[in-house]
């Protein structure tokens, strides 16, 4: 009865783990499913060939699906091998646990082929390994020559010869472009070459509005904007009592709490000392020229205060220009507002959504429009 209960518990535990895997891979013929969105996102990179984790060592541009894989790779640059073989007389060390386990299997295999040279106790599981050992360690013969013209190198094993040929004489196409519409490229030797090609020739773009993005991940986040309303995307609610604010990103919620509820003002004007919670508010303050410096102001003939003597001179010049052009400027402004003339020229940033004609002078204003209206 005890064994039956243990078996029932184990089966039930497996069923619970399986039931929690509610995030399915959307690709056809792929039945993978995961318990967390982050795991599904990692898996999707194997379909899209997206490797966002790139080695930053000079001269190395290898990229990986996961951050943990990049961490392991960097050990080859620092030569850190934390996994050591525990067999007596074996000092082998490895970068990963998997490589160590693969090496240990070599120790466990039967080794019927023993070296007969005097003083040598080496044994091998394959006869070819024994022959290579004798050539490399005892006779120092290199029986495998390179057959390419003008190449006189020789090697102790077939594998070393093949590695040399692949590296020095033959272009091995290891990576092909996954885009079906890509023509004119046979393939690439290195993963980094393929990634550079994809970034330049296949820029991720939205099929709905045409907007382009640096990575496929940014595009996936953008597509959600078309599929859901703004209120549906605001899933991060402020927990403070009496505050009904909600946000589309956790970072925006954290910033809101820090500024509005905790009063953290990280940005300040160097001239007047005014503090702001957001960088764009400081930028707006500087652009509008409303900054009041702490030093004693200069007063011109009109009785208007200025931050410096230069301000007085500029003001006087503007007064002269204004007196001569006031009527024409006012008339032009009224005409522009009525006719819409000059609206497009003054606003270089346009909304990328179809049937939306809003335009903006600043990129920041356009982003605020996208978040609040689309």
Swiss-Prot record:
Main subcellular location of this protein, as a coarse class: nucleus
Q: Which organism is it from?
A: Schizosaccharomyces pombe (strain 972 / ATCC 24843) (Fission yeast)
Q: Where are the zinc fingers (C2H2-type)?
A: 23-47, 53-77, 83-107, 113-138, 144-169, 204-226, 236-261, 267-291, 349-374
Q: What is the lineage of its organism?
A: Eukaryota, Fungi, Dikarya, Ascomycota, Taphrinomycotina
Under Gene Ontology molecular function, one entry of this record is:
5S rRNA binding
Q: What is this protein called?
A: Transcription factor IIIA
Spell out the subcellular localization from the entry: Nucleus
The answer to whether UniProt assigns keyword Lipid biosynthesis to this entry is: no
InterPro entries found in the cross-reference section: Zinc_finger_trans_reg, Znf_C2H2_sf, Znf_C2H2_type
